[in-house]
């Protein structure tokens, strides 16, 4: 099994070597092993390979129109997978979910971070000022 996680503001993915209740031991593509807090794990997946997921998700992220995503994002706090299901389809792929995560993360003028993988829509006034 592979894991996508956030570490110090950066997204990484690797193979889960072991998992406990509070953390997981993950091997990155480089061979480096890292201990990841369970709260930082955002996605679990079997396929594709971690580097492939990140590459495809970055491509998908660039196709997401922020204005459109902001328009139909819920007013309350929401998760990246929720937005992916609203934006793409009810059956958003793993790559689409990760792409939504990357796009939301890089657009603080549209979406504020409300926790690991959680976001809140920025007020309309803030968005107008940013544009």
Q: What is the meaning of each model-derived region?
A:
Residues 1-131:
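Charge-lined substrate channels and their catalytic hotspots, especially those that engage the 3′ end
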């Amino acid at each position: 099994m592979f894991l996508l996680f956030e570490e110090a503001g950066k997204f990484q993915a690797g193979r889960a070597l072991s998992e406990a209740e509070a953390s997981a031991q993950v091997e990155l593509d480089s061979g480096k092993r890292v201990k990841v807090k369970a709260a930082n794990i955002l996605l679990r997946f079997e396929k594709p390979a971690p580097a492939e997921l990140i590459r495809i998700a970055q491509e998908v992220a660039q196709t997401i129109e922020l204005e459109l995503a902001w328009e139909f994002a819920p007013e309350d706090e929401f998760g990246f997978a929720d937005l992916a299901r609203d934006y793409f389809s009810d059956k958003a792929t793993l790559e689409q979910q990760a792409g939504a995560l990357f796009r939301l993360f890089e657009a603080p003028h549209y979406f504020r971070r409300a926790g690991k993988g959680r976001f809140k829509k920025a007020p309309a006034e803030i968005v107008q000022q940013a544009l």
